A protein has these predicted regions:
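N-terminal catalytic or cofactor-binding beta/alpha core of small enzyme domains
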Residues: 2-6, 13-167, 172-178
Length: 178
């Protein structure tokens, strides 16, 4: 199997697992961030902020249907599979968000309105409309702070092993932005 075939197969598996988790109404993840290959010895540190389209049950799918949650607004399809393959080939640590960017976009600071967007492309996100300061703070505490802490820890650990890492973020893009 070629690396691109391997990545495509993993992407299909990820999407199926995410859909099954929503259908079963059970959490797929118990933490908003995962560090893979933490002791990787290469010069890179990989980051995948939009690795998952998982919406924890307490957010009620943010009022969206499965088609919206499978689309690019919820995650970067295929990015985690590519990041995993890169981590393997480069012997690099990988820090990946395990919650949809619609719950909290870990590529945005807490004060950014786009950290929890009320609209994305052609979609309105009902579960993000009119969030109170307290609700925004709760999501920041639940998702962003653990992600940033894991990223900081990974950077520091890499620095202690071999010096500052070259940080590479992994994303995917949709062929047509609506």
């Amino acid at each position: 199997m070629m690396p691109s075939d391997h990545a495509a197969a993993k992407t299909a598996d990820e999407g199926e697992r995410m859909t099954q988790a929503r259908e079963a109404d059970t959490p797929l993840h118990d933490t908003p961030v995962e560090v893979r290959n933490a002791s990787g010895g290469g010069p890179f540190l990989l980051v995948c902020e939009h690795a998952s389209n998982f919406i924890p049950p307490e957010y009620g799918m943010l009022g969206l249907d499965d088609a919206a949650l499978e689309s690019h607004i919820a995650w970067d399809p295929g990015a985690l599979a590519v990041a995993d393959e890169m981590a393997r080939l480069l012997d690099a640590p990988l820090v990946a968000a395990r919650v949809s960017r619609l719950v909290y976009d870990c590529n945005r600071p807490p004060e950014s309105p786009s950290a929890m967007p009320a609209e994305s492309e052609i979609y309105r996100i009902p579960g993000n409309a009119g969030l109170t300061a307290g609700q925004r703070q709760a999501r920041t505490q639940a998702v962003y702070h653990p992600f940033r802490a894991a990223l900081t820890t990974a950077i520091d650990a890499h620095g202690a092993r071999r010096g500052p890492p070259a940080i590479v973020t992994v994303h995917s893009f949709t062929p047509v932005w609506r």
